[in-house]
């Protein structure tokens, strides 16, 4: 049985930990509000960009003049996985679930005889994936500590991806991130970004058979050559915003659970402490009474 001193030290330690987890929960809640607003405000722009591109590309997909960012290289041999996680832990399964999705995808591709290359954004994804895919990791970036992600940072990542694609380093690129739904729901997501995965629209479905005659100046090809790289940056930026909100939501939930568990542990240890102290007092009283009777 632990001594009273051990129990007091244990209770003090748990109380100190509870203060830390409570503070982290409050910080995550404050950051979540900003991150959630940014993610929700970014979704319509990213979705509208994809919709505009889908309408423009309706007659070009699969055609000879289609940009390579839209039609791809025509091959499916080398895959680039862009895995976006966080730099910090204590966020529940946020980081591990994204890394697990990317790992399973990589294993499936390698089992099919494909070549896999990995680019990580965030320290935690790098820490997990390099255990198994050290030779496949070709680039890694941190999220810059506690600074909120911004468009220039997303542009750096997108420019690197685009440069590697134009250099012929891969055929298909897939982006891995966590889509924010709510504080308790973040969905690990895989999105193909090269060739661009565009939504099906009425214009794209009708294509050349549409009765509406539309002329573009400049041509669709020229517009797409300009917009597709922008769309790549927008999709990366959206993924980073979704990740930021998901990370804070997961951390807030995890720290709330840790705080409540610490409270339960304090109650349990305090009860044990009181029972142990009562037993010791009772034992001492019995010894005193027994000694008095012996006299």
Curated annotation (Swiss-Prot):
Compartment annotation: Cell inner membrane
InterPro entries per UniProt: ATP_synth_F1_ATPase_gsu, ATP_synth_F1_gsu, ATP_synth_F1_gsu_CS
Keyword Transport set for record: yes
Example of a GO biological process term: proton motive force-driven plasma membrane ATP synthesis
Entry's transmembrane regions: none
Classification via CDD domains: F1-ATPase_gamma
GO cellular component, one term: proton-transporting ATP synthase complex
Subunit (UniProt): F-type ATPases have 2 components, CF(1) - the catalytic core - and CF(0) - the membrane proton channel. CF(1) has five subunits: alpha(3), beta(3), gamma(1), delta(1), epsilon(1). CF(0) has three main subunits: a, b and c.
Family: Belongs to the ATPase gamma chain family.
Record protein name field: ATP synthase gamma chain
Organism: Methylorubrum populi (strain ATCC BAA-705 / NCIMB 13946 / BJ001) (Methylobacterium populi)
